[in-house]
């Protein structure tokens, strides 16, 4: 009876898993089939959609601080937390004997990170992310003490402080049981830092303006230079390499800012992207762009299913014997391989053909990834295969 129930449960679970995988893959393939007719077509974009001007960049800030007000979920013995709280107490005139090492269960050492956007001015606020550094179980409900945020040059660019917003939850019982939802040791503080120092973008006094593509492309960089010359006059823009375009402009922040605003809104025809297939092995996500083409190839893909059934029996000795009652496990391992029909891809098969062929054999995302890897190894797919 136990074996039959377990077989039924295993069959239902495997059936649900197959239906879930097929439904997810079906949605993915339907999406690809819907957008594939439009992916290869050239579209007029703005220059600002292809890259950015030199100096208009985000800078990362980092700081180390203390979160207080935790309900016994903080760091109990981390020396950094103790030293920081001792220094904070001394700042407010509270001295602590040197031989005293307090236990701070309501405080936690944290790392604060933030992105300083371009042209941020003193007095503006930015969002920050707070993450536990030590043994804190949760920082939910805590408040970050005032903390300086440093740039890569070691200068202070912002000051952070505020109450945390934590989406995770962690609860522990006295018997050792615990319940954790999401990540309770990381949170955010919207507008939690005030900018104290501005970053000079440096474009006002540079010998020329420089526009950089977000991704190197020889065709796109030439088209950007051509669009700028057509709008501003011949010889104003010169290609430096596969990423950068140099633009001559009069000196001065006001005139260059106006010129940059005009340039970034110029239309340009984006070149077709390189054929690329991206596979995220952890999530099963597969992205195929419309430039992928397939050479003649025949494909078949089998599926191997391994099943382990666990049953337990009881070994009961005689009443007058010296043996002991014991539980004896009984494992049954079976392997089943299913065969899929072979399908043939014609020369120059595009994304739609791949979607139809893979959908016809009912492949899962894992099967599709294996098929694409096989096509690449066989030299039948002219695309960059990127596995994350």
Curated annotation (Swiss-Prot):
Q: Where in the cell is it found?
A: Periplasm; Bacterial flagellum basal body
Described by its record, this protein's role is as follows:
Assembles around the rod to form the L-ring and probably protects the motor/basal body from shearing forces during rotation.
This chain's source organism reads Zymomonas mobilis subsp. mobilis (strain ATCC 31821 / ZM4 / CP4)
What protein is this chain from?
A: Flagellar P-ring protein
NCBIfam families attached to this UniProt entry: PRK05303.1 (NF003676)
Domain of life where this protein originates: Bacteria
HAMAP family named among the record's database cross-references: FlgI (MF_00416)
Q: What is the lineage of its organism?
A: Bacteria, Pseudomonadati, Pseudomonadota, Alphaproteobacteria, Sphingomonadales
Q: Does the keyword Signal apply?
A: yes
């Amino acid at each position: 009876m136990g074996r039959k129930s377990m077989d039924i449960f295993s069959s239902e679970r495997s059936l649900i898993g197959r239906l879930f995988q097929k439904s997810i893959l079906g949605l993915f393939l339907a999406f690809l089939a819907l957008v594939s007719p439009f992916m290869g077509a050239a579209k007029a974009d703005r220059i600002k959609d292809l890259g950015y001007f030199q100096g208009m960049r985000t800078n990362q800030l980092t700081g180390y601080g203390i979160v207080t007000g935790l309900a016994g979920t903080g760091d109990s013995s981390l020396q950094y937390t103790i030293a920081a709280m001792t220094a904070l107490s001394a700042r407010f005139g509270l001295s602590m004997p040197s031989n005293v090492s307090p236990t701070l269960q309501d405080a936690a050492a944290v790392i604060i990170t933030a992105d300083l956007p371009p042209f941020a001015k003193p007095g503006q606020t930015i969002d920050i992310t707070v993450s536990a550094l030590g043994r804190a179980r949760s920082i939910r409900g805590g408040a970050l003490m005032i903390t300086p945020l440093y740039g890569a040059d070691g200068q202070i660019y912002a000051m952070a402080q505020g109450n945390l917003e934590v989406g995770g939850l962690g609860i522990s019982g006295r018997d050792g049981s615990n319940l954790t939802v999401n990540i309770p040791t990381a949170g955010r503080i919207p507008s939690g830092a005030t900018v104290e120092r501005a970053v000079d973008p440096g474009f006002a006094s540079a010998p020329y303006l420089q526009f950089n593509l977000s991704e190197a492309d020889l065709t796109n960089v030439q088209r950007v230079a051509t669009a700028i010359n057509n709008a501003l006059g011949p010889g104003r823009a010169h290609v430096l390499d596969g990423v950068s375009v140099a633009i001559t402009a009069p000196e001065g922040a006001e005139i260059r800012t106006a010129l940059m605003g005009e340039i970034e809104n110029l239309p340009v025809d984006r070149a077709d992207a390189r054929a690329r297939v991206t596979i995220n092995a952890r999530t099963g996500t597969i992205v195929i762009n419309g430039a992928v083409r397939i050479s003649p190839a025949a494909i078949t893909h089998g599926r191997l299913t391994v099943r382990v059934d666990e049953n337990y029996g009881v070994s009961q000795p005689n009443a007058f014997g010296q043996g002991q009652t014991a539980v004896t496990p009984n494992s049954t391992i079976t392997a089943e391989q299913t065969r899929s029909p072979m399908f043939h891809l014609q020369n120059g098969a595009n994304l739609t053909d791949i979607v139809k062929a893979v959908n016809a054999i009912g492949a899962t995302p894992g099967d599709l990834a294996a098929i694409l890897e096989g096509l690449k190894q066989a030299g039948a797919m002219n695309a960059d295969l990127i596995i994350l």
